[in-house]
């Protein structure tokens, strides 16, 4: 029986897709539709070479998925005819979903109910699910939740110091994101260290335009930096991460900002974008560090925040840390950021191997600390698509 899974990841203005063999991890197709809802909406894909096409002015998720089915997959019948199931990345599952789920009407309603917790993401996921059901009515669909891995967090980690009834009645608590990536890295480290997953203690740094840190104890998430929403925690591309909540009142009451303006500022105009006042692109910050004030400022704040989180999470691991790991677009490719962060953690006896660190870029992986380092640091490429494909195959009965 075929175990080819179509993996879909619908963002607010993008659609990432892949066809993955859940049995051996082979990726037969990958692509990205981006700038959706804008005049420059386009789609790029890798299938027997690299390709790109314009989707048309204002094209949305439905048009992107239709192009993928009717043009890309249609050019490779052996792929489309052997698709066995569809897996969907879903950012927020609240407390309702502690693991991946076969999509039914009830599950779809549950995802819709969580939309207020991820207003940029969950509505897009719902569009993708419904479009996939329409395009492939015979295939089972599975939802794989970013929040599920973090449902093992203890109360001391997920509760906010707010009136308790806000949690009991409204579910206001820390949920965390990037769980699929944190889970994959945990499994990879177990293999690299020749340990059972249940014995692995790591601090994983998933660094991309969105970024989070996760403390993993005995193979389970015990704390993570993102909170009720993906806004909390680290400095990100356009998101502010941790701030004094009273800043919001000051912006509203003293400076006259509307709630909508504050929301836009914190989610789309802050982070590296806000600190540089130029761009959210980490490559600009890295390339101009020490030469341009705005780049230096942004990189220092980014690394300071990340190092503080890593250091703080050592307190959750009962005195044993097997490795610090870096993944995600920035984590896998930015040697300067990794070195700056690890150098700030010298109190833990960490020593960076600069040569190994430079080699661990653009697909390179491995240990980036010296043999004398008390704690190893590693670069590992994440593969969320594989985790989604494996869970989808399992729940679809493939």
UniProtKB/Swiss-Prot annotation:
PROSITE patterns: ACETATE_KINASE_1, ACETATE_KINASE_2. GO terms for molecular function: acetate kinase activity; ATP binding; magnesium ion binding. This is Acetate kinase 1. It is found in: Cytoplasm. The record marks 178, 239 as: Transition state stabilizer. Catalyzes the formation of acetyl phosphate from acetate and ATP. Can also catalyze the reverse reaction. InterPro entries: Ac/propionate_kinase, Aliphatic_acid_kin_short-chain, Aliphatic_acid_kinase_CS, ATPase_NBD. ATP binds at residues 16, 206-210, 281-283, 329-333. SUPFAM superfamilies: Actin-like ATPase domain. It catalyses: acetate + ATP = acetyl phosphate + ADP. Pathway: Metabolic intermediate biosynthesis; acetyl-CoA biosynthesis; acetyl-CoA from acetate: step 1/2. Belongs to the acetokinase family.
């Amino acid at each position: 029986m075929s175990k080819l899974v179509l993996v879909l990841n619908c963002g607010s203005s993008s659609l990432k897709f892949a066809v993955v063999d859940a049995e051996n991890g082979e990726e037969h197709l990958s692509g990205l539709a981006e700038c959706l809802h804008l005049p420059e909406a386009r789609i790029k894909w890798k299938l027997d070479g690299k390709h790109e096409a314009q989707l048309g002015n204002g094209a949305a998720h439905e048009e992107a998925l239709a192009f993928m089915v009717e043009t890309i997959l249609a050019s490779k019948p052996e792929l489309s005819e052997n698709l066995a199931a569809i897996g969907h990345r879903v950012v927020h599952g609240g407390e309702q979903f502690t693991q991946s789920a076969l999509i039914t009407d009830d599950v779809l309603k549950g995802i819709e109910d969580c939309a207020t917790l991820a207003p940029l993401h969950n509505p897009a996921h719902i569009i993708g699910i419904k479009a996939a059901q329409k395009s492939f009515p015979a295939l089972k669909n599975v939802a794989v939740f970013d929040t599920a891995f973090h449902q093992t967090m203890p109360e001391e980690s997920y509760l906010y110091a707010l009136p308790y009834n806000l949690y009991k009645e409204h579910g206001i608590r820390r949920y965390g994101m990037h769980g699929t990536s944190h889970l994959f890295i945990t499994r990879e480290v177990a293999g690299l260290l020749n340990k059972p997953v249940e014995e692995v203690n790591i601090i994983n740094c998933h660094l991309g335009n969105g970024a989070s840190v996760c403390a993993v104890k005995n193979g389970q998430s015990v704390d993570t930096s993102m909170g009720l929403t993906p806004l909390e925690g680290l400095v990100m591309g356009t998101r502010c991460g941790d701030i004094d909540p009273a800043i919001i009142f000051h912006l509203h009451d003293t400076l006259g900002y509307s709630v909508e303006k504050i929301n836009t500022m914190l989610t789309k105009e802050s982070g590296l974008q806000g600190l540089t006042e130029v761009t959210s692109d980490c490559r600009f910050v890295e390339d101009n560090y020490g030469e341009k004030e705005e780049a230096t400022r942004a990189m220092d704040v980014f690394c300071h925040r990340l190092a503080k989180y890593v250091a703080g999470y050592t307190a959750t691991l009962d005195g044993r840390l097997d490795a610090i790991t870096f993944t995600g677009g920035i984590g896998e490719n930015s040697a300067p950021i990794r070195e700056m962060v690890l150098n700030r953690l010298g109190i833990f006896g960490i020593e960076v191997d600069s040569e190994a660190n430079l080699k661990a870029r653009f697909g390179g992986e491995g240990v980036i600390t010296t043999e004398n380092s008390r704690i190893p640091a590693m670069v590992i490429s994440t593969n969320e698509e594989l985790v989604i494909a494996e869970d989808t195959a399992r729940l679809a009965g493939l």
